[in-house]
Amino acid sequence: MKAIKNKGQDKTMNETTHRFARLVDLSAVQATSTEADVRACAELAARYNIISVHVLPCWTRFLSTLLPQQGTGEVMIGGPVGFPGGGHTTDTKVQEVRQLIADGAREVDMVVNIGKVLSGDYDYVREDLRRVVEAAAPVPAKVILETHYLNEEQIRRVCEIAVEVGMKWVKTSTGWAPTGATVEKVRIIADQLKGRIDIKGAGGIRDLATVRALYQLGVRRFGMSHGAVTKVLAELEQHPERFPELNAD
């Protein structure tokens, strides 16, 4: 399998486009994601030096053959754990983490046990998250809240648990629920976290206006599809001034 060469930052790329690319988790995590989709994501990521590509676990090892060089300044591989419903046992999630890392993942995004959150069983949720963090270390872990199904109190509780157990990121959504990274839910997350750990927005992020709105709330990683990322990159290549916040930071 021929690897896709990562040439680093394209010399023709403006600084705004480059900075945006380093905020993107390029994702092919739908049930219908194919080998061609994974390859297309790898090619786009290598071209723009996108920070990471996330695929379903069955594609992780294949993706690692396309993106063999990882580390600072390179394209990382990420993978989901307990995806998409979060209802896997903790032991299963731990095994998934170990397999993903063995296959080349350098980030893991774990779905919280939504049913346990809705049931108010926060002791279970805490231990579930803690063991995934422990299994992943030193690979950073994100917890996916699937905010569509949670109310404000539940979002705040899980955010606090995430901080307590050492999660590096709180992520809004899987992209499988009816809604994803809404301004309303991201505002709650940002207010609760207060910068202690980072925020990833995912689900329904399809244009620059949405990216900017979420960035202004503190989102610093964007889970987006190949089509959405391509659209935003093309706009920023022509109009870098449309994302002034990125150049101000």
From Swiss-Prot:
Localization terms from the record: Cytoplasm
Source species, domain of life: Bacteria
Primary role: Catalyzes a reversible aldol reaction between acetaldehyde and D-glyceraldehyde 3-phosphate to generate 2-deoxy-D-ribose 5-phosphate.
Catalytic residues (positions): 109 (proton donor/acceptor), 171 (schiff-base intermediate with acetaldehyde), 200 (proton donor/acceptor)
An annotated GO BP: 2-deoxyribose 1-phosphate catabolic process
EC number: 4.1.2.4
InterPro entries reported in the protein's UniProt record: Aldolase_TIM, DeoC, DeoC/FbaB/LacD_aldolase, DeoC_typeI
Keywords annotated in UniProt: Cytoplasm, Lyase, Schiff base
HAMAP family per UniProt: DeoC_type1 (MF_00114)
Catalytic function, reaction form: 2-deoxy-D-ribose 5-phosphate = D-glyceraldehyde 3-phosphate + acetaldehyde
Gene designation: deoC
SMART domains in alphabetical order: DeoC (SM01133)
Pathway: Carbohydrate degradation; 2-deoxy-D-ribose 1-phosphate degradation; D-glyceraldehyde 3-phosphate and acetaldehyde from 2-deoxy-alpha-D-ribose 1-phosphate: step 2/2
Gene Ontology cellular-component annotations: cytoplasm
Family to which this protein belongs: Belongs to the DeoC/FbaB aldolase family. DeoC type 1 subfamily.
Protein name, per record: Deoxyribose-phosphate aldolase
Sample GO molecular function, one term: deoxyribose-phosphate aldolase activity
